[in-house]
Design a protein with these regions (language model features):
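Glycine-rich, charged/polar anion/phosphate-binding loops
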Residues: 1-2, 83-86, 113
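Glycine/small-residue-rich phosphate/adenosyl-binding loop
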Residues: 1-52
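Short secondary-structure boundary segments
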Residues: 19, 75, 103
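GST superfamily/GST-like fold recognition
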Residues: 46-47, 66-82
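Alpha-helical transmembrane segments of helical membrane proteins, especially in multi-pass transport
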Residues: 54-56
Length: 135
């Protein structure tokens, strides 16, 4: 087992962010939001997942700001049933991944493909004014 995985297995904190589509649709059907139905068609993307992802990012950022180590990782689909059963998670709540938080280990460098692959340039990922527009 690699050092990083061993460290994640003993992290003192594991957070599993859960998205709940029903809670999201219910909230936006309340009078102060202006809609009275739960029509999913109003959403161009599943914002219940997007908002959960943004909350996850804030958890990661806060952990790092506090000098801790943190890592987001996906939960393999074949393990979600066991996770639900172990923690009594209702079927309408969807885990979007997991976060481990602990004291950061010494970083020996990344041996994986990310270390060998060059980062894309800003011109490759940022478009100004229109797709392909340079800045």
């Amino acid at each position: 087992m690699s050092d990083w995985l061993g460290g994640m297995r003993i992290a003192p904190v594991v957070i599993v962010p859960l998205a709940c589509k029903g809670a999201y649709l219910d909230r936006y059907a309340e009078p102060d939001k202006g809609w009275t139905d739960r029509d999913e068609g109003r959403w161009p993307a599943p914002y219940w997942h997007i908002d959960t992802g943004m909350a996850t990012l804030l958890i990661l950022q806060t952990a790092v700001d506090e000098g801790l180590g943190a890592c987001f990782f996906g939960i393999p689909p074949e393990r979600i049933g066991g996770f639900r059963e172990a923690f009594g998670v209702p079927s309408d709540h969807t885990p979007i991944g997991a976060i481990t938080i602990g004291h950061r280990a010494q970083d020996p460098g990344t041996p994986g493909s990310a270390a060998r692959r060059a980062r894309r340039t800003a011109d490759e990922v940022v478009h100004r004014g229109r797709w392909g527009g340079k800045g």
